[in-house]
């Protein structure tokens, strides 16, 4: 497959630093090479880090994004840098998960979008947040939710 149509990407293949905050981050997208074909894309970030806005203590999550693209796909380096910009941000788990969903929704206009934040326990309580929009096409499947063991590939 020829590599063309990616000239609008400004971060992939170039030196790019982590933005100071998520509002400054740009989530880049590129043309879906298979428009009209329903398929599910999963992005998993096992090391999302934020700061508790009250205590200043770090919070950690596995972020799972499932989407069925229409015309655009997420460029993964820009998404990684976007997520890195949360490292020093004071935010609650629910707000962070919903904000990531909004930014992806604005960037993609996906047929289906689900963002799941599986937050590590704090004070003995885990918080799992799910924000979902659109209908999953009947010919698409979702992998089970859960933390994947990246060494074995098992959930």
UniProtKB/Swiss-Prot annotation:
Disulfide bonds: none annotated. One of its GO terms (biological process) is tRNA modification. It is found in: Cytoplasm. It holds the Pfam family QueF. The gene is queF. GO terms for molecular function: preQ1 synthase activity. It comes from the Bacteria. It is an enzyme of class 1 (oxidoreductase). Substrate binds at residues 74-76, 93-94. One of its GO terms (cellular component) is cytoplasm. The keyword Oxidoreductase applies. Pathway: tRNA modification; tRNA-queuosine biosynthesis. The active site is at residues 52, 59. This is NADPH-dependent 7-cyano-7-deazaguanine reductase. HAMAP family: QueF_type1 (MF_00818). It catalyses: 7-aminomethyl-7-carbaguanine + 2 NADP(+) = 7-cyano-7-deazaguanine + 2 NADPH + 3 H(+). Keywords: Cytoplasm, NADP, Oxidoreductase, Queuosine biosynthesis. Catalyzes the NADPH-dependent reduction of 7-cyano-7-deazaguanine (preQ0) to 7-aminomethyl-7-deazaguanine (preQ1). Its EC number is 1.7.1.13. Belongs to the GTP cyclohydrolase I family. QueF type 1 subfamily. Its main location: cytoplasm. Coiled coil: none annotated.
């Amino acid at each position: 497959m020829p590599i063309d149509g990616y000239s609008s990407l400004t971060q992939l293949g170039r030196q790019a630093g982590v933005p100071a905050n998520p509002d400054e981050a740009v989530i880049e997208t590129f043309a879906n090479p298979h428009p009209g074909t329903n398929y599910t894309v999963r992005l998993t970030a096992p090391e999302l880090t934020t700061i508790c806005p009250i205590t200043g203590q770090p919070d950690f999550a596995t972020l799972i994004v499932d989407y069925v693209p229409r015309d655009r796909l997420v460029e993964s380096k820009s998404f990684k840098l976007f997520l890195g910009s949360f490292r020093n941000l004071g935010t609650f788990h629910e707000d962070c998960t919903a904000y990531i969903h909004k930014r992806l929704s604005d960037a993609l206009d996906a047929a289906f979008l689900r963002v799941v934040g599986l937050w590590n326990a704090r004070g003995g309580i885990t918080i799992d947040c799910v924000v979902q929009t659109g209908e999953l096409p009947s010919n698409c499947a979702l992998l089970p939710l859960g933390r994947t063991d990246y060494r074995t590939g098992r959930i």
